[in-house]
Amino acid sequence: MKTFTAKPSDIKRQWLLIDATDKTLGRLASEVAMILRGKNKPEYTPSMDTGDYVVIINAEKVAVTGNKRKGKIYHHHTGYIGGIKSISFEKLIATHPERAIEKAVKGMLPRSPLGRAMYKKLKVYAGENHPHTAQQPQAHNI
């Protein structure tokens, strides 16, 4: 018996629609990362991108537990001396609600060209509307 390896012709991608309203950020992100990698499919192959496209709506209504809404801090560096920037989860959700989910999911994907290809299949929107109705995304419950 040989190990199954998916070929590009074997991969059939779907578009999934996930509503982030009142979903815990980390639990949502881990489920989405698994779908983007394709680990929920029987034809999963580690060296290939077998995952589906994921559209997340209502990113502004995502929940966090405890007092992370005020206490969780996101850091990044500009590349210049003394250029470390910090923003709290509360301010990030107020200004760019989709970035919190994007950062959480990106941290759960591989750090390689394959991981970057998987990340491109993630579409996050702050509100109810999204421009992917032509792809007919199927509602997916988490």
From Swiss-Prot:
Source organism's superkingdom? Bacteria
Cellular component GO terms, alphabetically?
cytosolic large ribosomal subunit
Function recorded in the entry = This protein is one of the early assembly proteins of the 50S ribosomal subunit, although it is not seen to bind rRNA by itself. It is important during the early stages of 50S assembly.
Query: GO molecular function of the protein, one example?
Result: mRNA binding
Q: What is this protein called?
A: Large ribosomal subunit protein uL13
Q: Which family does it belong to?
A: Belongs to the universal ribosomal protein uL13 family.
Q: Which InterPro entries does the UniProt entry name for this protein?
A: Ribosomal_uL13, Ribosomal_uL13_bac-type, Ribosomal_uL13_CS, Ribosomal_uL13_sf
| Biological process annotations from GO | negative regulation of translation; translation
- Which Gene3D superfamilies would you find in this protein's record? Ribosomal protein L13
Keyword line: Ribonucleoprotein, Ribosomal protein
Assembly and oligomerization = Part of the 50S ribosomal subunit.
